[in-house]
């Protein structure tokens, strides 16, 4: 489907308290993805990279936030906008080793 490599589509996993809760309770994994990536491309990239079956992909664009820069005078800038994807895996697939490589899990996997 896509000519891009999977690691060009998936930029990095998002590791926060909320994403960890989604991971443990609902089998959902959160990634920062390329801004122009589509849902089918994201699904294909996750399936190829991690050898799992993806049930569903939800995407959202995170708006830029204002930041203050204290140089000579008070100046304002913004962070860049980015795209977030929440990937739901099939029911039988739970807690893969690729998650533990990013964050040490309690179960010692």
Swiss-Prot record:
Keywords: Ribonucleoprotein, Ribosomal protein, RNA-binding, rRNA-binding. Pfam families: Ribosomal_L23. GO terms for molecular function: rRNA binding; structural constituent of ribosome. GO terms for cellular component: ribonucleoprotein complex; ribosome. It comes from the Bacteria. Part of the 50S ribosomal subunit. Contacts protein L29, and trigger factor when it is bound to the ribosome. This is Large ribosomal subunit protein uL23.
């Amino acid at each position: 489907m896509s000519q891009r490599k999977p690691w060009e589509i998936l930029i990095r996993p998002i590791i926060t308290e909320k994403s960890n809760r989604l991971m443990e309770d609902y089998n959902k994994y959160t990634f920062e993805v390329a801004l122009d990536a589509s849902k089918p491309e994201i699904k294909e990239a996750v399936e190829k990279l991690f050898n799992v079956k993806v049930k569903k992909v939800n995407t959202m664009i995170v708006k830029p936030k204002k930041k203050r820069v204290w140089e000579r005078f008070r100046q304002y800038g913004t962070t860049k906008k980015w795209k977030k994807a929440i990937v739901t895996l099939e029911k039988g697939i739970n807690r893969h080793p690729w998650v533990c490589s990013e964050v040490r899990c309690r179960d010692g996997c």
